Amino acid sequence: FPYTTLFRSEKMIKRAGLDYWDKLDVRTYINFEDFLEKNNDPKIYMATTKAKHVYSAPAYEDDEDVYIMFGKESAGIPEEILLNYEETSIRIPMLPHIRSLNLSNSVAIVAYEVLRHQGFKAFQMEGQLHHYKW
């Protein structure tokens, strides 16, 4: 499951990778236009509080590359970008007048929904006790 993440600093990349560097595919882009050029007409879901569609609605097909863009916690994705993605903008339902979830929680929720739609390929589906048997 390749991850493409846009970070603003080297420090953010190192913090996000922790001890999983051998499992990450980090790609760097100059800006959003650079990302679009290098990823041959990608289907992008824009995760935003401004969206009309709930994150669980898309099919996230098994054979499609799924790109989900999240904005900064403080500002979100610029509206100039969102204008071109009305149908693929998605949101996590929230109670009215309640601040949105933090970015890491939002990424986890949406990423696992995509993985669920795609059958959790390559994921361990069963756990086991360490000191006892079921």
Residue ranges, per PLM feature:
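Mobile beta-alpha loop/short-helix "lid" or hinge segments that flank ligand
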Residues: 8, 79, 83-86
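S-adenosyl-L-methionine/SAH cofactor-binding core of RNA-modifying enzymes
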Residues: 12-79
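Structured adenosyl-cofactor binding patch, chiefly the S-adenosyl-L-methionine
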Residues: 84-134
